[in-house]
């Protein structure tokens, strides 16, 4: 693999030398919520081979985008985590998602891998919550055909920003839950949330969902006006 594939003295080319390879930005996206082990990254990136993932992670560690933490456990455990350099890419992911909403968004295609968490993990770079909105929403996605059968995410809105973590939050201000198909309808172009179960602060939960929907709606409007 060539270390500097573009060999051009320009800041965008220098940036693409580091993050322009296939899978790199998706790995950053999938580590936004916190460190992951190798097998966890394999789960959320099913299209990448074991050797490709190992090579890409090694390169990202060498480039200062990731840290690798080894634990003395049986079996051995290695965690990968974003560095400050990589966290500065979160707004870049948000801008890329904005572009995708405007020009490439739609219902899942035949054969396309569906991972609701992949959309939720974009929240820190994508969403700008309404002024004064503050609180946490626990979001649970269930799909019996997958392992594990349910995944739980916590989105927190505070000071005009949104953060995400993959954990349970029994004391969250609001709880949203539903099967994967319900989340696809809720986060897709139709923004149909009727099949999601809501408990707690409805205003907060709906505002965060609206933030996803607003991006899609705003993008669709911009596309129609273009």
Regions found by a protein language model. Name each.
Residues 11-48, 58:
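N-terminal helix-turn-helix DNA-binding core of bacterial DNA-binding proteins
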Residues 85-154, 203-226:
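Acidic, aliphatic-rich amphipathic alpha-helical segments
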Residues 138-192:
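Low-complexity, glycine/alanine/valine/leucine- and proline-rich hydrophobic stretches
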Residues 51:
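Key DNA-contact positions within bacterial/archaeal DNA-binding proteins
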Residues 169-226:
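C-terminal interaction segments
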Residues 20, 72-95:
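Basic, amphipathic "hinge/linker" alpha-helix immediately C-terminal to the N-terminal HTH DNA-binding motif
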């Amino acid at each position: 693999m060539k270390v500097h594939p573009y060999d051009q003295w320009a800041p965008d080319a220098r940036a693409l030398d580091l993050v322009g390879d296939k899978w790199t930005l998706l790995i950053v996206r999938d580590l936004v919520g916190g460190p992951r082990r190798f097998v966890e990254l394999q789960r959320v990136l099913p299209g990448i081979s074991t050797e490709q993932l190992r090579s890409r992670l090694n390169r990202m560690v060498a480039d200062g985008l990731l840290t690798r933490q080894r634990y003395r456990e049986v079996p051995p455990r290695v965690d990968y985590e974003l560095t400050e350099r990589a966290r500065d890419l979160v707004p870049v992911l948000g801008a890329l998602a904005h572009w995708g909403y405007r020009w490439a968004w739609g219902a899942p295609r035949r054969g396309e891998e569906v991972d609701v968490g992949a959309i939720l993990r974009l929240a820190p770079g994508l969403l700008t919550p309404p002024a004064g909105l503050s609180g946490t929403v626990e979001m649970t996605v269930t799909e019996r055909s997958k392992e594990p059968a349910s995944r739980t995410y916590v989105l927190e809105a505070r000071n005009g920003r949104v953060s995400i973590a993959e954990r349970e939050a029994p004391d969250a201000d609001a709880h949203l839950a539903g099967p994967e198909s319900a989340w696809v309808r809720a986060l897709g172009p139709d923004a149909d949330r009727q099949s999601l179960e809501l408990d707690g602060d409805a205003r907060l939960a709906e505002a965060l969902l609206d933030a996803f929907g607003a991006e899609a709606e705003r993008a669709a409007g911009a596309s129609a006006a273009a």
